[in-house]
Each structure stands twice: as structure tokens, then as C-alpha cells.
UniProtKB/Swiss-Prot annotation:
Catalytic reactions on record: 5-methyl-5,6,7,8-tetrahydromethanopterin + coenzyme M + 2 Na(+)(in) = 5,6,7,8-tetrahydromethanopterin + methyl-coenzyme M + 2 Na(+)(out)
Annotated protein name in UniProt: Tetrahydromethanopterin S-methyltransferase subunit F
Family: Belongs to the MtrF family.
Enzymatic class: translocase
MF GO annotations: tetrahydromethanopterin S-methyltransferase activity
This protein's pathway: One-carbon metabolism; methanogenesis from CO(2); methyl-coenzyme M from 5,10-methylene-5,6,7,8-tetrahydromethanopterin: step 2/2
Transmembrane segments: 49-69
Enzyme Commission code(s) on record: 7.2.1.4
Main location per the UniProt record: membrane
GO BP annotations listed: methanogenesis, from carbon dioxide; methylation; one-carbon metabolic process
Description of how the protein assembles with itself and partners: The complex is composed of 8 subunits; MtrA, MtrB, MtrC, MtrD, MtrE, MtrF, MtrG and MtrH.
Protein's job: Part of a complex that catalyzes the formation of methyl-coenzyme M and tetrahydromethanopterin from coenzyme M and methyl-tetrahydromethanopterin. This is an energy-conserving, sodium-ion translocating step.
Membrane topology: Single-pass membrane protein
Classification lineage: Archaea, Methanobacteriati, Methanobacteriota, Stenosarchaea group, Methanomicrobia
Length: 72
């Protein structure tokens, strides 16, 4: 009688995992895209003020300092 409990229920059909695997891969791909985009946004936000200051100083150099130095 103990042998009957160890056998379990025989599987009639093999499980169809193709659709589940495709869905899991789709979710994994989307999660990676979201993570990449979030990292990019964080990097841009962290360096935005420095980039703005560098661009402003460069524009002052090009508009004011160089024409005065050249004599225009």
C-alpha cells in the first residue's frame, strides 16, 4: 500500500511550455529596456548642470573672448 503513494499521478500530456517561455523572454527583454533607459536618464540628470555650465562657458568664450582677442 505504501508503494501506491510513491507512484504519483502519471502525466497524460507533456506540458506546452513554448508560449510561457516566449512570454517570459518578452518580459525579460522589456525589463532590460526599462532598466537601460532608467540608467541613461539618471546619468543625464546627474550631469545636466555640469554640461549646461560647460556649454555656457564655451559659448562665452566663442562670442566674447575670441573676437576680442582676434580684434574683431
Amino acid at each position: 500500500m505504501a508503494e501506491e503513494h510513491e507512484k504519483g499521478v502519471p502525466m497524460v500530456l507533456a506540458p506546452q511550455m513554448g508560449a510561457i517561455d516566449a512570454t517570459v523572454e518578452s518580459i525579460r527583454y522589456r525589463a532590460q529596456l526599462i532598466a537601460r533607459n532608467q540608467k541613461l536618464d539618471s546619468g543625464v540628470a546627474a550631469t545636466g548642470i555640469i554640461g549646461f555650465a560647460a556649454g555656457f562657458l564655451f559659448s562665452l568664450l566663442m562670442v566674447i573672448v575670441l573676437p576680442v582677442a582676434v580684434g574683431l
